[in-house]
Amino acid sequence: MSFVTQLLEIPGHSSPSVYLLDAREVDLDQTTLRATARALSVGGRYSSRSYRYPFALVAVHEDRVGVDIERTTSWEPQMFRSILTPGECEPHASPSKHEWATSVWSSKEAMAKALGNPMDYDPRRLESPLLWPPGGAGRWQASTLPVPPGHVGWICWQPLFVGTRIR
């Protein structure tokens, strides 16, 4: 499929495979884009999808994984504060930094998806992977994704370690 680009696959490092779908390449409507993304997501034990038409991200992995793509947008100060943990409310954390604010939200959305049901997690209690130390947090890894300009993309996953049994 020429409208699908593989964004991430590091052989031997137990990382997920991530694909970017661009509906503009083959003139897909939203419904067909979503159906195509669902079809791509059957390749692993776990999968995650995110949509911001005309784009979709799909991640497949043998362990937990979450992916998110967001269009960079302006943030109202009250809305921005409603997604931050107390530790994220630093002077540099400003809603006027639209890409940073969108990246905080996208990273939290990807993490919540990797944990299970994103609706179960309050963003004010979920630390953004954007602020994690290098190497991740515990067993979790996270990375930004090279998505089209004007968008932010994140992936969070649990890497498989040597000796991990796949059922």
Regions found by a protein language model. Give the residues of each.
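Core catalytic alpha/beta fold that binds nucleotide/phospho-ligands
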Residues: 1-167
